[in-house]
């Protein structure tokens, strides 16, 4: 049975809105209340996305207390040509350089392949940890669409009808995005 309240730890308002949409889509009865805690968690510097999310979730549990169902979500953007980098470091790339400069990193290479990956780490009311992951393959393109949500305007998913995430309607994006896929798995677990 799904818990009645789950705490999502994030300080990212766009991410929070998207997660609210993703959870509400399945929860027709309103049986789960999503609470937000914008805790400032340390981020493990690693290329192992599951380890990063799990470490953040353990920190959140330490701050909020065992017994509170809590989850964190970490997103990565990996370039095939760079053997998985920038990966989880994409957040720092975005803070230090423009989207245009990120695209230029791949300019010398013909392979513009990329993967968008979301990893969810969840701790249930019994203190047990669970990991869920969603991956969407795509490519890096020149920026198209609004630039107000991370790197959405430079990632074009293979099954995205030639559009970047930023050019898509939210409902369509959520059916094929890395975050949408991760939340499908998370919701299956919650409602099992």
From Swiss-Prot:
Positions bound to Mg(2+): 43
One Pfam family linked to the record: Ham1p_like
Molecular function via GO: dATP diphosphatase activity; dCTP diphosphatase activity; dGTP diphosphatase activity; dITP diphosphatase activity; dTTP diphosphatase activity; dUTP diphosphatase activity; GTP diphosphatase activity; ITP diphosphatase activity
Any one Gene Ontology cellular component term annotated for this protein: nucleus
Main EC class the enzyme belongs to: hydrolase
Reaction(s) this enzyme catalyzes, per UniProt: ITP + H2O = IMP + diphosphate + H(+); dITP + H2O = dIMP + diphosphate + H(+); XTP + H2O = XMP + diphosphate + H(+)
CDD domains: HAM1 (cd00515)
EC number from the UniProt entry: 3.6.1.66
Cofactor mode of binding and number, as noted: Binds 1 divalent metal cation per subunit; can use either Mg(2+) or Mn(2+).
Record Gene3D superfamilies: 3.90.950.10
Keyword presence, Transmembrane helix: no
Keyword set, alphabetical order: Cytoplasm, Hydrolase, Magnesium, Manganese, Metal-binding, Nucleotide metabolism, Nucleotide-binding, Nucleus
Keyword Cell division carried by entry: no
Protein localization: Cytoplasm; Nucleus
Positions of ITP binding: 10-15, 56, 74-75, 91, 149-152, 173, 178-179
Cofactor: Mg(2+); Mn(2+)
Subunit text: Homodimer.
PANTHER family attached to this UniProt entry: INOSINE TRIPHOSPHATE PYROPHOSPHATASE, INOSINE TRIPHOSPHATE PYROPHOSPHATASE/HAM1 PROTEIN
UniProt family annotation: Belongs to the HAM1 NTPase family.
Protein name: Inosine triphosphate pyrophosphatase
Organism (species): Candida glabrata (strain ATCC 2001 / BCRC 20586 / JCM 3761 / NBRC 0622 / NRRL Y-65 / CBS 138)
Organism lineage: Eukaryota, Fungi, Dikarya, Ascomycota, Saccharomycotina
